[in-house]
């Protein structure tokens, strides 16, 4: 990250590497930033017009951590790809940080349906690298769990 300070604000630029609980090491997804929500939606429209709507893996939603609007797809090789809007570009350093708890569903998604189970369990393995079990026992609430509660 490149962090710069200006007028009591902090901005973070460049790339993010996010570590999440789960079996690993594995690659969960790569992400592409778009400047506006309309760009993310336009991408979904283009995918649909090309007959690729079924590649949508999770969507649409807004992450609690970062407040980014997102859609996830699968590329032709099965890797998960996210398109998302800006997130935490400007942070007021006087603002009290939010402490997110693993049991708080809003950290992953502020609104919309939870992700399907496969979203949490499927990821790309690295060649010749053994996969280890998760370090924390924090089972997610999945779409399947959510829908089971309705029946």
Question: Where are these predicted regions, by residue range?
Answer:
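Intrinsic, low-complexity N-terminal interaction/targeting segments
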Residues: 13-19
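Aromatic/pi-system hotspot detector in well-structured domains
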Residues: 5, 15, 82
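Well-ordered beta-strand positions
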Residues: 4, 20, 72-74
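Long C-terminal interaction/binding lobes of large macromolecular proteins
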Residues: 24
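Single conserved hydrophobic/aromatic residue that forms the stacking wall/gate
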Residues: 1-12
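Vicinal oxygen chelate
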Residues: 32-151
């Amino acid at each position: 990250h490149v962090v710069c300070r200006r007028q009591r604000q902090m901005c973070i630029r460049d790339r993010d590497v996010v570590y999440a609980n789960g079996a690993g090491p594995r690659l969960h997804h790569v992400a592409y930033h778009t400047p506006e929500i309309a760009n993310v939606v336009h991408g979904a429209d283009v995918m649909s017009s090309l007959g690729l709507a079924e590649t949508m893996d999770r969507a649409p939603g807004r992450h609690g951590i970062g407040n980014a609007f997102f859609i996830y797809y699968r590329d032709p090789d099965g890797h998960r790809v996210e398109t998302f809007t800006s997130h935490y570009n400007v942070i007021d350093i006087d603002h009290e940080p939010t402490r997110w708890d693993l049991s708080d569903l809003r950290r992953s998604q502020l609104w919309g349906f939870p992700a399907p189970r496969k979203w949490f369990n499927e990821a790309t393995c690295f060649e010749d690298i053994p996969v280890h079990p998760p370090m924390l026992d924090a089972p997610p609430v999945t779409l399947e769990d959510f829908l089971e509660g309705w029946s």
